[in-house]
Amino acid sequence: MSAGIEYIVKRTNRLHTAGVAILIVAVAISCTGCTDKPDWRVTDDGILEYNKPAPGSDYRLRTLEETDNYTLCEVTYESRGAVIEGLIRMPKTAAGKGKSVPGVVLLPGATVTKEGEQGLARYLEGIGYASITIDQRNLGGIDMEADLEMFLSGVEPIEHRMVYDALFAAEVLRKQPNVDPDRIAYLGESNGGRFAIIAYALDSDALGVVAISTCGYGIDAAVAAGRIRDPEAIRFYRSIDPDTYLSSIRPHHRPGKFVMIHSLNDPIIGYENAQATYIAAGWRKSLHTIETEGHGYSAEMNPFLESELAEIFS
């Protein structure tokens, strides 16, 4: 059993008794027609659904750096009760040539800031791609127990809102004049990779996702083993598990690709866990490995990133 499943099972058991009482309250709220967000839904099968974000003038840009090779802008936007800050890095390869470049929504791992992710963003800029990197809520940290309590009481969990933040970031990137809105992909590291996978599954216009040093939670395996029994807890945990979405891409989703890159000697997320998630994917996919011990992006992954993004955007 993976560490992710163990974490979830322990908290589900702790909350089971309280959850029944909370669920009764949630049903009462639902019957009165009161919901936290009318465009936030979780299906009976545990699939998260959002209406597509439509940013107008409700985001702000401020130029931080401008060189012969790139422009770096700070972006700020409001998303479901929070102010999200990000950085847009734009290569100048297309400037003044009437061309547009593909764009990547870049989601860092837990505790990593948008500034701390700029090494990867600079690499993407160097091979011709724009990127938007956001400071995720709680800097990507999650509290599953608190989110489950919110869900059982009919309140939109933070982890769901973090997916929406990524979807909003994609729409902001699509609005940039030098970005091709039809060529957008998601790229995430560690916990950011989980959100990247789910956001890609919900974004029917995106072309692919690259997940570095990440894995799903294996919720269905825990349910099958009888370790999680409460139906509403199952529905919530499936909604935050990337594995749930790997075989359920909506029929109208554009042809895309699922890419994983992982160290065989990752000390945080074992390769076997990443492999289990990769096997669960039912669509065009690739898995690349490096041997260097470490967790997250490293320059050793660059050849895989370059070739896979070129294929995704071709």
Predicted ranges, named:
Residues 1-37:
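Secretory targeting signatures
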Residues 53-98:
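N-terminal cap/lid segment of alpha/beta-hydrolase-fold proteins
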Residues 98-109:
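Short beta-strand element of the alpha/beta-hydrolase
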Residues 111-164, 221-227:
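Cap/lid segment of the alpha/beta-hydrolase catalytic domain
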Residues 153-155, 214-242:
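A catalytic-pocket lid/entrance helix-loop region that shapes and gates access to the active site
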Residues 167-228:
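Primarily recognizes the serine-hydrolase "nucleophile elbow" in alpha/beta-hydrolase
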Residues 231-280:
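The feature captures the conserved acid-bearing segment of alpha/beta-hydrolase catalytic domains
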Residues 275-314:
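C-terminal catalytic histidine-bearing segment of alpha/beta-hydrolase fold enzymes
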